[in-house]
């Protein structure tokens, strides 16, 4: 083989000898001086690294070629380095998990974590036409592909550094453990229901009644929420009726609402949006009070509406022996409003809604905007502590100092206590709606927390984006005890179709796997469905219906998967595969070859080495062996060393000869029979006996 001296290669590449020596050391190639010789393999790698135009072309070409199916990755075997430790070896079908942080997505750092020389990785990929540099940054996808070739599966873990947002959250968790500090907090109420059933009219009636009792004059502006007093106790209403906003808030981890008022018109009954609103509230696990509205209308039927509540939603009224509070009202005339408010206070008392009454405030942003006159504005509902003018605040990646507070009447106030909705002037930028607001001790702390939150958001977006569960992931997830439920939202073109789907899906369930239909409905997939899917980590299934343009945009932003089908058998087939993906894989023992010990070599300080003639199949160092003598099994264990002549190898096929050292076993004799086997994990399948027809 031709040899090239270091200085000769440096001259060829038009770089200094020192630069080349540094490059070689980075690749893990040790050289003593400019006169050191390099073999052709190393020369080719270095030349390849410096041929930038070829590199660009090869990388572009490799982008498609290096994408392998999971099966190909599992079947690929990389030769184990001679000195690789036993615990690093990969058993067929088993993946070793390597936990790394986002900052460790670099080739040299990844190689170090895998305990594989970076020069070997560079060389292995160079032979495939892929040029890698030791210090180059890697995308998560590329890092996973490289790791898989050496028997590893990557898991990205949070960097071990103080998270100031988490610290603020834990601070309140600790305070809540001391029940002696807690007091009753005014409930926050959201009104939901079908369009035209009177949600806005109800909110207006409650608001106007409260104002009339106190003073002349209306509210000068809407800040997104208001509060009323009933028998000396406060109730806060979010003045943005609609379950989309409610669920969007929950999808972002903010639970502002304590109680939901479900409005149902007595002359119309339970409608599709009523079902939708109920499912949103049920998913959030908040108490529901039903307000049967429009009882003043001639064709109103309270009893018929109660019947529909029980049959369609499972909400059985208290006077029917159930546990759902149902209040007949007329938002138009005011009838029943006082009773409804009293029921809200009763439910709040039973729910034991608590807060920390003093100290630094915490709240939830429910509205935000940029005002040309005063700059960023944000409406917050205070959940804990006292918010005052002059406080330093942070909400997500935004921060500031409270310059002014305004109540729902537009009046400036000095402070806000738990349950109060107030508008804040003083943020550096418009904060995200539904962000958690914290009061901190200084402007520097506020800046630090906001900067950390911003950086965290960037890293999360860079790593994986905002993405919820996907159906195909369930098809291969397997083995995760904590994941045995598949959440679905079903939309179809007719009631008959959706009912047929629900019945068919129910037959797919077993003791091990479960499908939870979070919501079902008729018609186009809309933005409300997407927000519910985001909140409940569900997949949306459309049967003979499609998403509207807003839903498609929203799904892309939220990372929610929408699957649309025209044939019910295709839908059921995908669900079967998804459910099978939830099952623990089955480990099987597979015999892959046989051999016979023809010679035994006794080596001092090493032990007995078997000279083996392979009779059929193959032997792999990562597998196992059973040894039989006179048809009796005398050993079943691992292979410590596998050699072909003097070379350590990972696999040998019949009819070749090889040398084998058995792990912790030396009692071998000529004529012993060997049976080689491997352990594989195989996907389990479910035997479904459902019968379904296309609706």
From Swiss-Prot:
Region span, G3: 239-242
Region of interest called G4, as start-end residue ranges on this chain: 293-296
Region (G5): 330-332
GO CC annotations on file: cytosol
Disulfide bonds: none
Binding site for GTP: 193-200, 239-243, 293-296
Subcellular location: Cytoplasm
Tagged with keyword Aminoacyl-tRNA synthetase: no
Protein name as it appears in the record: Translation initiation factor IF-2
Taxonomic lineage of the native organism: Bacteria, Thermotogati, Thermotogota, Thermotogae, Kosmotogales
